[in-house]
Amino acid sequence: MIIHSLLDTDLYKFTMMQAVLHQHPAAQVDYRFKCRTPGVDLAQFIDEISREIDALCRLRLREDEVDYLRSLRFIKPDFADFLALFHLDRKYLTLAASAAHPGEIELTIRGPWLHTILFEVPLLAIINEVWFRNTSEPDFEEGRSRLREKVRSLRSMPAGCKIADYGTRRRYSRQWHGELLPLLRDGLGEQFVGTSNVFFAKQYGLTPLGTMAHEYLQAFQALGPRLRDSQVAALDSWAREYRGDLGIALSDVVGLDAFLRDFDLYFCKLFDGMRHDSGDPFEWGERVIAHLEAHRVDPRTKVLVFSDGLNIDKVMRLYEHFSPRCRLAFGVGTSLTNDLGPTPLQIVIKMVRCNGQPVAKLSDSPGKSMCEDLGYLRYLRDVFGLPPMPEAGDPARQ
């Protein structure tokens, strides 16, 4: 059994889930799985994946786990009570081998947002671990050696250069994830600020980290009053839920240009900072700093969070570039939790519909966008003033 606890997920799944419970408990959503790594035959392991999903759906939170969530200042009593009764229901999930694309799997989640939001991260962790335990021999000593070198590199930086673990969804295995976190904690001291994984935060006395994911802002494309106002509606909703807590806004759901147009003086003052998850991080940071300064907000009072495909070298370069002009945070994922030699899988589960309407992410990085409805993509780009989609046959179209 790969997943032993419903806490073995990212914190932002719980923080978004709480907002859904309080504000949109009736919302219905669709998610789709996609493997971006070519030539990966996951279909051969579909029975093993299915058994792991069955085990996941039998899990409930233990009393001590619910008590841990209650201890977090932003978790409200009614949500903790709800989680004490919660379990994932297999009826909302379909898994089959793809008839159109041999070797691929078709994984769909469809149902109430409140009851399906916790599927994504453990499903990705399951698929990763099933793949790697069947296709590679783990070289944990090589992984430990690489980890020690990363610790040495980071220790050579100023004490303000700090990282967090964001690697649950693409980890090599649960065992390796559990081993590396205390190594980072003990090796880096205050330069290791915590983990997005709630289970391991509880187990190792680490700070659980996270705010919102793309799906939260995507859903408001169907939940908000107007499509053009969907980002503003999502950020307002978040502010109502958390009243100044968990104040990191995600900037790339419909691209940085559109985000900055919506992130006005009110949001610049209200939120603690912004998170980068696609596009050139150096260009992004410069534009965010300039945006804050244009609104007479001192960037040194705000946090820029970087979380897109980071490794330790990139962390150090970003820190040297932006410090001390702003506060900095770095969430490192695959480079920490899946660096034992085998090539990591590029797999995602993304929301594609909400209340029967298509929703989409228009990433600042080519290839990271995902939507089933090309007509909606064209409309979304037009509404937010983005360049038209490339014509059929243009490599950029893919």
From Swiss-Prot:
<dbReference type="Pfam" id="PF04095">
    <property type="entry name" value="NAPRTase"/>
</dbReference>
<comment type="pathway">
    <text>Cofactor biosynthesis; NAD(+) biosynthesis; nicotinate D-ribonucleotide from nicotinate: step 1/1.</text>
</comment>
<dbReference type="Pfam" id="PF17767">
    <property type="entry name" value="NAPRTase_N"/>
</dbReference>
<comment type="function">
    <text>Catalyzes the synthesis of beta-nicotinate D-ribonucleotide from nicotinate and 5-phospho-D-ribose 1-phosphate at the expense of ATP.</text>
</comment>
<keyword id="KW-0436">Ligase</keyword>
<comment type="similarity">
    <text>Belongs to the NAPRTase family.</text>
</comment>
<feature type="modified residue" description="Phosphohistidine; by autocatalysis">
    <location>
        <position position="214"/>
    </location>
</feature>
<keyword id="KW-0597">Phosphoprotein</keyword>
<dbReference type="InterPro" id="IPR040727">
    <property type="entry name" value="NAPRTase_N"/>
</dbReference>
<dbReference type="InterPro" id="IPR007229">
    <property type="entry name" value="Nic_PRibTrfase-Fam"/>
</dbReference>
<protein>
    <recommendedName>
        <fullName>Nicotinate phosphoribosyltransferase</fullName>
        <ecNumber>6.3.4.21</ecNumber>
    </recommendedName>
</protein>
<dbReference type="InterPro" id="IPR006406">
    <property type="entry name" value="Nic_PRibTrfase"/>
</dbReference>
<dbReference type="GO" id="GO:0034355">
    <property type="term" value="P:NAD biosynthetic process via the salvage pathway"/>
</dbReference>
<dbReference type="GO" id="GO:0004516">
    <property type="term" value="F:nicotinate phosphoribosyltransferase activity"/>
</dbReference>
<dbReference type="GO" id="GO:0005829">
    <property type="term" value="C:cytosol"/>
</dbReference>
<keyword id="KW-0662">Pyridine nucleotide biosynthesis</keyword>
<dbReference type="InterPro" id="IPR041525">
    <property type="entry name" value="N/Namide_PRibTrfase"/>
</dbReference>
<dbReference type="InterPro" id="IPR036068">
    <property type="entry name" value="Nicotinate_pribotase-like_C"/>
</dbReference>
